[in-house]
């Protein structure tokens, strides 16, 4: 007897399908701020949602990794694997990482391509530096932080993201509203359709 739980059953129970919203952007672009507010809005709707970011990944799962290009790639690979497990369990995962290299983003997408949504949190380097309350950019320019994205290491913008959120011209609230609309179409509507189909099957199509 198979006592497994299907993705369709999870979607019906949760009211949405699982998904990975992969936020990519410069430090200071607004990734974590948007991620946390979006998580709150989705949680208030009763959705299964969780944020993965440097705060909860670097202190535990990836505490053995540094910031070399190789370690950064491995950091994202591990996050991608964890996000895929969450998504396959029916959770909406919001991953907020700089993810500067296209190849690394392609690698993460390849782990769970049917669940992956590439969200570019866009802001100019100048705007990000102005928002930098921790002084990270100043330290990077002084040579105190090596391989700092945007200063001494490149950021390759996504070529075909699913959404671009320009945080220089949009408020955090406006960005979240755009994401909620996107989630409704991409993750909630498929679950609604499943519910309609299951109701029709149960009623014999009446």
Name each region found by the language model.
Residues 18-20, 48, 92-94:
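Residue-level preference for the first positions of well-ordered beta-strands
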Residues 122-125, 130-178, 185-196, 201-202:
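Small-molecule kinase domains that catalyze NTP-dependent phosphoryl transfer to phosphate-bearing small molecules
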Residues 51, 116-120, 162-164:
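Conserved beta-strand scaffold positions in the cores of enzyme catalytic domains, especially
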Residues 27:
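The conserved Walker
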Residues 36-84, 88:
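Conserved substrate/cofactor phosphate-moiety recognition/catalytic segment
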Residues 31:
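Conserved lysine of the Walker
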Residues 1-21:
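Extreme N-terminal, non-catalytic leader segments
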Residues 58-67, 71, 83-141, 147:
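ATP-dependent NMP and nucleoside kinases share a basic, alpha-helical "lid"
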């Amino acid at each position: 007897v198979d006592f497994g739980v299907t993705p369709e059953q999870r979607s019906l129970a949760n009211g949405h399908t699982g998904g990975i919203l992969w936020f990519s952007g410069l430090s200071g672009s607004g990734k974590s701020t948007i991620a946390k507010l979006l998580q709150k809005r989705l949680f208030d709707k009763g959705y299964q949602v969780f944020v993965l970011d440097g705060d909860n990944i670097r202190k535990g799962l990836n505490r053995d990794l540094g910031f070399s290009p190789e370690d950064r790639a491995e950091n994202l690979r591990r996050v991608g694997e964890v996000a895929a497990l969450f998504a396959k369990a029916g959770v909406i995962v919001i991953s907020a990482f700089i993810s500067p290299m296209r190849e690394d983003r392609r690698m993460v997408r390849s782990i769970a391509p049917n669940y992956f949504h590439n969200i570019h949190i866009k802001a100019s380097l100048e705007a990000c530096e102005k928002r930098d309350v921790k002084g990270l950019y100043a330290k990077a320019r002084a040579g105190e932080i090596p391989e700092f994205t945007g200063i001494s290491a490149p950021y390759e913008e996504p070529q075909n993201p699913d959404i671009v959120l320009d945080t220089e011209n949009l408020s955090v609230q406006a960005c979240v509203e755009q994401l909620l609309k996107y989630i409704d179409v991409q993750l909630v509507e498929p679950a609604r359709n499943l519910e309609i189909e299951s109701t029709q099957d149960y009623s014999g199509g009446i």
